[in-house]
């Protein structure tokens, strides 16, 4: 009761607002508790913003990691030849590409050979010859910190560009061969033998459409003399010979390249 006058004076100095009381533990009483908008969505974001951002960040990092993994395509395996020329009875190959497990090599005359499909990159290997580990001194080597000497090989894509080009060409040739393949049926290697009566037969009559040779036609006045009329398709890829005149023989052949026709003339003196 004795503090009533002092509280009034303090209240007047603060504009008429009463300061909330605190208990001995430092908290405010329930009746004097300040009003904080805890039910407001802005206050909720204020207290829980860090908790919400953390899982979003983890999800983004995981998504980014998946993209990086997908972008890294596996290296293509390339056939690689390993050869041991130092002799021996039993030769094995071990390397970083097979977890250093022993792989037997195949004897080829005086050498031992193995062909493995290795991914592009750097690989170390070693030979196990008649119970002894050794390396090939004629090939590149690398020495580890412990003093172990291994052979090293670089599998590069550029080393196989020629083989890739040949493979593409072979695929194109195989596609053409499928279109121009022979019909099914029995075949043999025996040459055709002419019968006696066939030797005295007259040659077959020339088909009439082959008589219309371009070189035997007159060029129209309205046409360019340097250009020939479009030939018939049956005249393509045939060799024609004109009558010998003034001691010169003229040979001609017409070929088609897409929509263009090219006629080649060969003049041969007799």
Swiss-Prot record:
The keyword Lipid metabolism applies. SMART domains: AMPKBI. A lipid is attached at residue 2 (N-myristoyl glycine). One of its GO terms (molecular function) is protein kinase binding. Residues 1-43 are annotated as: Disordered. It comes from the Eukaryota. Keywords: Fatty acid biosynthesis, Fatty acid metabolism, Lipid biosynthesis, Lipid metabolism, Lipoprotein, Myristate, Phosphoprotein. One of its GO terms (cellular component) is nucleoplasm. It holds the Pfam family AMPK1_CBM. GO terms for biological process: cellular response to nutrient levels; fatty acid biosynthetic process; nail development; positive regulation of cold-induced thermogenesis; signal transduction. Phosphorylated when associated with the catalytic subunit (PRKAA1 or PRKAA2). Phosphorylated by ULK1; leading to negatively regulate AMPK activity and suggesting the existence of a regulatory feedback loop between ULK1 and AMPK. Residues 21-36 have a biased composition (Basic and acidic residues). Transmembrane segments: none annotated. The modification Phosphothreonine is found at residues 4, 19, 148. Residues 68-163 are annotated as: Glycogen-binding domain. The modification Phosphoserine is found at residues 5-6, 24-25, 40, 96, 101, 108, 182. Non-catalytic subunit of AMP-activated protein kinase (AMPK), an energy sensor protein kinase that plays a key role in regulating cellular energy metabolism. In response to reduction of intracellular ATP levels, AMPK activates energy-producing pathways and inhibits energy-consuming processes: inhibits protein, carbohydrate and lipid biosynthesis, as well as cell growth and proliferation. AMPK acts via direct phosphorylation of metabolic enzymes, and by longer-term effects via phosphorylation of transcription regulators. The glycogen-binding domain may target AMPK to glycogen so that other factors like glycogen-bound debranching enzyme or protein phosphatases can directly affect AMPK activity. AMPK is a heterotrimer of an alpha catalytic subunit (PRKAA1 or PRKAA2), a beta (PRKAB1 or PRKAB2) and a gamma non-catalytic subunits (PRKAG1, PRKAG2 or PRKAG3). Interacts with FNIP1 and FNIP2. Belongs to the 5'-AMP-activated protein kinase beta subunit family. This is 5'-AMP-activated protein kinase subunit beta-1. It comes from Homo sapiens (Human). The gene is PRKAB1.
């Amino acid at each position: 009761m004795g503090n009533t006058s002092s509280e009034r004076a303090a209240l007047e100095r603060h504009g008429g607002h009463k300061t909330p009381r605190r208990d001995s533990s430092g908290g405010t009483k329930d009746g004097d508790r300040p009003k904080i908008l805890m039910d407001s969505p802005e206050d909720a974001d204020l207290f829980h913003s860090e908790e919400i951002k953390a899982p979003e960040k983890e999800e983004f990092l995981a998504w980014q990691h998946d993209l990086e993994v997908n972008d890294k395509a596996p290296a293509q395996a390339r056939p690689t030849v390993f050869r041991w020329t130092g002799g021996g009875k039993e030769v094995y190959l071990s390397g970083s590409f097979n977890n250093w497990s022993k792989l037997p090599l195949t004897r080829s005359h005086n050498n031992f050979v193995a062909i493995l499909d290795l991914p592009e990159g750097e690989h170390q290997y070693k030979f196990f010859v008649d119970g002894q580990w050794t390396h090939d001194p004629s090939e590149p080597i690398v020495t580890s910190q412990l003093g172990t000497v291994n052979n090293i090989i670089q599998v590069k894509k550029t080393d196989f560009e020629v083989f890739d080009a040949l493979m593409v060409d072979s695929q194109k040739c195989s596609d053409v061969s499928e279109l121009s393949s022979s019909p099914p049926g029995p075949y043999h290697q025996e040459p055709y033998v002419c019968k006696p009566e066939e030797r005295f037969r007259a040659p077959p009559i020339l088909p009439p459409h082959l008589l219309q040779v371009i070189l035997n036609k007159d060029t129209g006045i309205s046409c360019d003399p340097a250009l020939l009329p479009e030939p018939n398709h049956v005249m393509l890829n045939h060799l024609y010979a004109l009558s010998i005149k003034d001691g010169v023989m003229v040979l001609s052949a017409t070929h088609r390249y897409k929509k263009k026709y090219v006629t080649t003339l060969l003049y041969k003196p007799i």
